[in-house]
């Protein structure tokens, strides 16, 4: 397990500049996965903007195996928002936008 570390406070602490909690995205990735790379790039960008905090978990890790056992994704990556499945496979930016706007992720 590793937390994405950016120079921005909000990316590592899970708080925006005004100290409001932001949703926590967990990205479960595997090797040689272009969809994982795409999701990582988009979620990293959003973490840098303060929309969310990002934790990247490798499927080979203990935490990754536990997430696979719990959520049984059909394909990778698996994206969780505050511990709840947002989707697997290609990241739906529309679904992510809707979840962030609704405020129902917490």
In which residue ranges do the predicted regions lie?
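Local sequence-structure signature of Cys/Sec-based thiol-disulfide redox active-site neighborhoods
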Residues: 10-49
